[in-house]
A protein has these predicted regions:
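C-terminal transmembrane bundle of multi-pass solute transporters/carriers
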Residues: 32-33, 44, 50, 54, ...
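Helix-loop junctions on the cytosolic side of multi-pass membrane transporters
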Residues: 99, 103, 145, 149-176, ...
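Residue-level signal for alpha-helical transmembrane segments in multi-pass membrane proteins
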Residues: 8, 64-68, 131, 135, ...
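Juxtamembrane intracellular "pre-TM" segments in multi-pass secondary transporters
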Residues: 165-200
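Helix-loop boundary and gating motifs at the non-cytosolic
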Residues: 1-29, 187-239
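Substrate-agnostic recognition of the 12-TM MFS/MFS-like secondary transporter fold
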Residues: 1-3, 24-40, 46-61, 78-137, ...
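Helix-breaking motifs and short loop linkers at transmembrane-helix boundaries and internal kinks
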Residues: 14, 46, 68-73, 279-283
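Residue-level signature of transmembrane alpha-helical entry/exit and packing/kink sites
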Residues: 19, 75-79, 194, 198, ...
């Protein structure tokens, strides 16, 4: 879906960077509305059940979407609605999925577990993206989205059989107390210096870093490097290879000291690599671009698990869902970043805009290291 959706948008809109950015913004915007509520659900209900229900909803939405696509009834406004509803469903999945990890592994292995989770995502990125590129190149977009439906069906089955110990939670007190829980989660997250710092870092990454795969990469593939749908699929796979290497390396080393400084360093490296990638594309060298993409994947897989592990370890068991829900507000910045990336790429060109966004990541890391000592003290 990561490969097929941007290509479908470009196909429906005649290559519009603006619509691509807005679609990706629509996909992540529901996290703004539902993120904190989803965190409350993750703390008040069985997290496995929350994950199961969201996956069933996404499965149904995906099946309806494929039916519209196969029958040639899909139009652009329907695509906006689908991406919003899917984003709303996944907004409830993420806090529960992230908060459930400490219930499965000991505290000293949380970083390893988050890194291995990221590694599994990279394996699917490698296989799924390459497969999507081949399916689209030799088949159709409909076939790619049809494959997604089967994958979600498998996810529903595996989640059903997931054996997770119940977590400490308060009894559900009714809809009236949701606002109280909402305010409590905001006060706790913002009152904790470490959590507040991680959220600010997450906002910077969401605005400047997340737009690469959602907006810039498909534009580079089709409009700059000229490698088309199949090439874009392989680009995502190559990034997955780098991501897998980074995730497995982090899980093997499992740093227990200076994790805050490491997190900021990996974000700075990711920003510098974004600038380098855009610079390499001026040479029109696909090989060099793909080499940089490998390192981009590694940088992302080193930064993101550390950020999540620090966050989840900084919250008590009964608050973890709500804290992860607060982090979901960073997805609002992903929506903003995606929209800005599409608009700016349409006006300034994709290469210059990517350089600007890469510098944004780099500046975020440097400023937080310089001005926010609480993150440097995280071990």
């Amino acid at each position: 879906e990561m490969v097929a959706l941007p290509l479908l948008v470009l196909d429906l809109t005649g290559g519009s960077a603006v619509h691509l950015g807005l679609i990706m913004a629509t996909r992540t915007a529901p996290a703004v509305v539902f993120g904190l509520v989803a965190g409350i659900f993750a703390d008040n209900f069985d997290r496995r059940l929350v994950m199961l229900v969201t996956k069933i909803v996404v499965l149904i939405l995906s099946a309806l979407f494929v039916a519209l696509l196969i029958t040639d009834l899909l139009v652009l406004w329907q695509l906006y609605i689908f991406t919003f509803l899917r984003g709303a469903s996944m907004a409830f999945d993420q806090p529960a999925r992230r908060a459930i990890i400490p219930s499965i592994v000991p505290n000293n292995l949380v970083t390893n577990a988050v890194a291995l989770t990221m590694g599994s995502v990279q394996i699917m990125r490698i296989a799924g993206a390459a497969g999507a590129g081949l399916i689209i190149g030799f088949g159709s977009l409909s076939a790619a989205f049809g494959t997604v439906v089967f994958l979600y069906a498998g996810a529903v089955i595996f989640t059903w059989f997931l054996d997770v110990p119940d977590h400490q939670r308060q009894a559900y007190r009714g809809i009236r107390h949701i606002l109280t829980d909402f305010n409590e989660s905001i006060r706790f997250a913002w009152g904790n210096a470490t959590i507040r710092g991680v959220i600010i870092i997450g906002i910077g990454y969401a605005i400047f870093g997340m737009a690469f795969m959602q907006v810039f990469a498909p534009l580079f593939a089709k409009q700059v490097l000229g490698i088309g749908e199949t090439g874009f699929g392989f680009m995502v796979s190559v990034m997955g290879i780098g991501g897998l290497i980074g995730a497995l390396g982090l899980a093997a080393v499992s740093p227990t000291r200076n994790r805050g400084t490491l997190m900021l360093g990996f974000l700075a490296a990711f920003g510098a690599l974004l600038v380098l990638f855009s610079g390499v594309t001026y040479l029109n060298s696909v090989v060099l671009a793909f080499i940089v993409v490998i390192f981009l994947g590694a940088g992302q897989s080193l930064f993101f698990p550390l950020m999540n592990a620090i966050l989840v370890e900084s919250a008590p068991e009964a608050m973890r869902g709500r804290v992860m829900g607060v982090l979901s507000l960073d997805r609002a910045m992903t929506a903003l970043g995606g929209a800005l990336a599409g608009i700016a790429a349409g006006a300034l060109g994709v290469q210059l805009t990517q350089i600007i966004f890469g510098v944004g990541c780099l500046i975020t890391a440097i400023l937080m290291y310089t001005l926010y000592p609480a993150l440097r003290r995280v071990q």
